[in-house]
Amino acid sequence: MVSIIKTCRRFEWPVDFLSVISDRPCEGIVKARDLGVNGELLDREKLGKDVFQAELFKKITTYDPDIVVLAGFMVILDAKLFSRLFNVMINVHPSLLPEFKGLNTHQRVLNENVRKHGAS
């Protein structure tokens, strides 16, 4: 997330970062704020799955973004609820999907001696 913000700024791309939203307390919110970007917490554990997803959808649509980037976001979103946003969402995943989806991606790649690895 920090790299995305810094790269866009370094190349002076016409991008406004509206918010960084996390589902758990994390350093990403602090780093976003340090870069002058709104950092928000929607605590998934406290809200529960359904309320969390509804609140996240409401928050995102309130911003009316041109693009939504999911980076380091370890939640499978409700397809029905988020279908309206699918054409503006990018999910950055640390593997060449569909291989090695889920947690511990890099360790599993190493354990299986895979020669080719990347991001989707």
Segments from the language model and where they lie:
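One-carbon transfer enzymes
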Residues: 1-120
